[in-house]
């Protein structure tokens, strides 16, 4: 069975991508699985300079999910190129660099630095954990257009724009990204959330609020992928609470060309293998010859 998919001319051997964040730069997981099993690996968020992230506690478990407010902890782009990228390139998989800027100029500079070194760049306009920048950019279609166009003007590799779900109409963001030249969009990022310790009456996250991921957000994500599929022609990478192959299949039917898995990696490092096997068995059982035949095939 052929599980190959194509995004902006880049062929992935299968549609399962490691989502930015929970997979880090793959080192920890490489001790548990062959990370070449992924069609692509999306790095944790990269900034121009090193960031120590938000104060602890910055992660808590809730019903059917996790709230995090890590705050883009990362070594900075120079250290990523020198220390992490050679390791990632030693595996048989595509590399997607997730970039985060606090101004249009920073997004452009990161793109210039990385565009010839990776297979694709994912522009994170939707991180809900950092007060200065990301959320403002991600919620405003005009800013989404402006930054996407600025990044595309200096990019030699395909550009994926990652969208926030914390808006009234995510399709406006999707259309803005497409009109600005985005090669693909990815959605959804985490949903703004909060949890409280009733004994101390204090938030469980030091920064008070964070981003909810995991099974709790899957129905929201599927709905938003479906809505965007009806509005744009560029590929959609779907994510949000995918725990097994059945979840992945829902995203394909709703309109996703590929999927990203994040929170499940914490629980089951071998999820990528199980999801791939499940997808293949489903396609065979239903008589599909490829993933492409399944994409957007919902019966209304």
Swiss-Prot record:
Catalysed reactions listed for this entry: (S)-dihydroorotate + NAD(+) = orotate + NADH + H(+)
Top-level class of the enzyme under EC nomenclature? oxidoreductase
| Catalytic residue positions | 127 (nucleophile)
- What keywords are assigned to this protein? Cytoplasm, Flavoprotein, FMN, NAD, Oxidoreductase, Pyrimidine biosynthesis
Q: What is written in the cofactor note of this entry?
A: Binds 1 FMN per subunit.
Binding positions for substrate per the UniProt entry: 44, 68-72, 124, 189-190
**Protein name (Swiss-Prot/TrEMBL):** Dihydroorotate dehydrogenase B (NAD(+)), catalytic subunit
The opening ranks of the lineage are: Bacteria, Bacillati, Bacillota, Bacillota incertae sedis, Caldicellulosiruptorales
């Amino acid at each position: 069975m052929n599980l190959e998919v194509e995004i902006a001319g880049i062929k992935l051997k299968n549609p399962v991508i490691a989502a930015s964040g929970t997979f880090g730069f793959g080192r920890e997981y490489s001790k548990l699985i062959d990370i070449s099993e992924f069609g692509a690996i999306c790095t944790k968020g990269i900034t121009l300079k090193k960031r120590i992230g938000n104060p602890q506690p910055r992660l808590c478990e809730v019903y059917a999910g996790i709230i995090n407010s890590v705050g883009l902890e990362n070594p900075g782009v120079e250290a990523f190129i020198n220390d992490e990228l050679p390791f990632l390139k030693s595996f048989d998989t595509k590399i997607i660099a997730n970039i985060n800027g606090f101004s249009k100029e920073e997004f452009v500079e990161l793109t210039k630095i990385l565009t010839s070194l990776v297979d694709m760049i994912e522009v994170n306009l939707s991180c809900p954990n950092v007060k200065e920048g990301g959320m403002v950019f991600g919620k405003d279609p005009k800013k989404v257009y402006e930054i996407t166009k600025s990044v595309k003007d200096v990019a030699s590799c395909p550009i994926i724009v990652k969208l926030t779900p914390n808006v009234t109409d995510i399709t406006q963001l999707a259309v803005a990204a497409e009109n600005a030249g985005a090669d693909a969009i990815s959605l959804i990022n985490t949903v703004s959330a909060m949890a409280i310790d009733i004994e101390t009456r204090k938030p469980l996250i030091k920064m008070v609020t964070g981003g909810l991921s995991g099974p709790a957000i899957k129905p929201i994500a599927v709905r938003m992928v479906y809505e965007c599929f009806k509005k744009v022609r560029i590929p959609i990478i779907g994510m949000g609470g995918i725990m097994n192959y059945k979840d992945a299949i829902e995203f394909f039917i709703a309109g996703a060309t590929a999927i990203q898995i994040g929170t499940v990696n914490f629980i089951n490092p071998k999820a990528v293998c199980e999801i791939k096997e499940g997808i293949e068995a489903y396609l065979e059982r239903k008589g599909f010859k490829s993933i492409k035949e399944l994409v957007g095939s919902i019966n209304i």
